[in-house]
From Swiss-Prot:
Keyword set, alphabetical order: ATP-binding, Kinase, Nucleotide-binding, Transferase
Protein name: Putative 4-diphosphocytidyl-2-C-methyl-D-erythritol kinase
Pfam families, A to Z: GHMP_kinases_C, GHMP_kinases_N
Active-site residue numbers: K10, D136
Organism: Streptococcus agalactiae serotype V (strain ATCC BAA-611 / 2603 V/R)
């Protein structure tokens, strides 16, 4: 039997660093959405007690450094599963891009193994496993428009956003999330008013929403990679309603209220970077 799961990418409409916790991790406040740029995870059972991963992408590890492997390993150990599993990853989401590719693949693996082995895990049990892997995995288990708090383990659904078009631009380099978080100075970092952004979403005020969007990590990443600032400026000059880095970068996204605007932004970026995508929000 094969189990198929779609693994959509995520964007951070807002990312605020509230402070550093005693354990060295950071307290976060984020608003995230899912987009129709997807990886696909296919899982089948093996008689031999092992975890085998293969992929159509050469840009990711296929061993225990992969978040998908970690998800399967945790579940096998936690539930005493002595059977093996083969996991096939079909990648469309760029790697090390701030789009949650590894996290959404891990979340899809958790959902798939829950079905394959009839584990009957509820949402909270899956979140507990996901949080052991990474701070974005709990969100990726459910996706949609959500407020994410704590270290990523608290996920509160928000209303679906009005339809809009999104253009993604991924520069030709990746970013290590850990390296960006190591450079955070909580006293001087720029802050984002997540409460205002949340209010704009709750009131369906698109103009206030785009004005309220922000990312506390953006300045840190731009200092090391100024091309991100150039991409943002180019998008805005082409008519984007807002241009913002997602996650720890380097991907920049723009939101556009009409497809005509999105096409202008897309065409202006197509020759500037190799990886440019026009996508929609998942509803």
């Amino acid at each position: 039997m094969k189990i198929f799961e779609k693994a959509p990418a995520k964007l951070n409409l807002g990312l605020d660093i509230k402070g550093r916790c005693d354990d060295g991790y950071h307290e976060l406040a984020m608003i995230m959405v899912s987009i129709d740029l997807n990886d696909y995870v296919t899982i089948s059972e093996l008689k031999e007690d092992c975890i085998v991963i293969d992929s159509d992408s050469s840009k990711m590890p296929l061993n225990n450094d992969n978040d998908v492997f970690k998800a399967a390993d945790i579940i096998k150990n936690q539930y005493g599963i002595n059977k093996g599993v083969h996991i096939r990853l079909e990648k469309s989401i760029p790697v090390c891009a701030g789009l949650g590719g590894g996290s959404t693949d891990a979340a899809a693996t958790i959902r798939a193994l829950n079905r394959l082995w009839n584990l009957q895990m509820d949402y909270d049990e899956m979140v507990a496993i996901g949080f052991k892997i990474g701070s974005d995995v709990p969100y990726c288990l459910g996706g949609g428009c959500s407020l994410v708090l704590g270290k990523g383990e608290i996920v509160k659904p928000l209303p679906t956003l009005r339809p809009c078009w999104i253009v993604l631009v991924k520069p030709d380099f990746g970013i290590s999330t850990k390296s960006i978080f190591r450079d955070i100075d909580c006293k001087s970092i720029s802050r984002v008013d997540i409460d205002l952004l949340k209010s704009a979403i709750l009131s369906s005020d698109y103009q206030l929403m785009v004005k309220s969007m922000g990312n506390s990590l953006e300045d840190i990443t731009i200092t090391k990679n100024p091309v991100i600032s150039t991409i943002k400026e180019r998008m805005l000059n082409s008519g984007a309603d807002v241009a913002l880095m997602t996650g720890s970068g380097p991907t920049v996204f723009s939101m556009c209220s009409t497809e005509k605007k999105a096409d202008r932004v897309f065409n202006s970026m197509k020759g500037f970077c190799k990886e440019v995508y026009k996508v929609r929000l998942l509803r």
